[in-house]
């Protein structure tokens, strides 16, 4: 079941695909780069076919269903969740604010 209604179409499409087995399911993996996002505030572009929301639950599900032994991930973000106001040079700190909020959600055990 999709975590967000906006993700229904792509999640139904993905569910039709045949899963590929992990080649080395016991090999510990550090995913060197992942993003988190919530695109619902932006107009949907007809050429894009993506999950509109991809946060804790979505990445956790992807990792859990992958068959791989992902032990850590590295969060990377660029140009998203900037602060709406304040000094221009500090607006990018909104990305850090955002990921701290996501980490707090994760620690709460509810997300």
What kind of feature is each model-predicted range?
Residues 1-111:
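Helix-coil boundary/capping segments in enzymes
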């Amino acid at each position: 079941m999709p975590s967000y209604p906006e993700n229904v179409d792509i999640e139904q499409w993905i569910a039709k695909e045949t899963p590929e087995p992990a080649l080395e399911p016991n090999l510990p993996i550090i995913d060197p780069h992942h993003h988190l996002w919530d695109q619902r505030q932006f107009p949907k572009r007809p050429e894009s076919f993506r999950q509109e929301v991809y946060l804790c639950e979505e990445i956790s599900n992807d990792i859990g269903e992958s068959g791989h032994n992902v032990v850590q991930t590295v969060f990377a973000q660029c140009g998203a969740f900037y602060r709406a106001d304040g000094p221009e040079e500090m607006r990018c700190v909104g990305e850090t604010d955002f990921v701290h909020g996501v980490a707090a959600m994760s620690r709460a055990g509810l997300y």
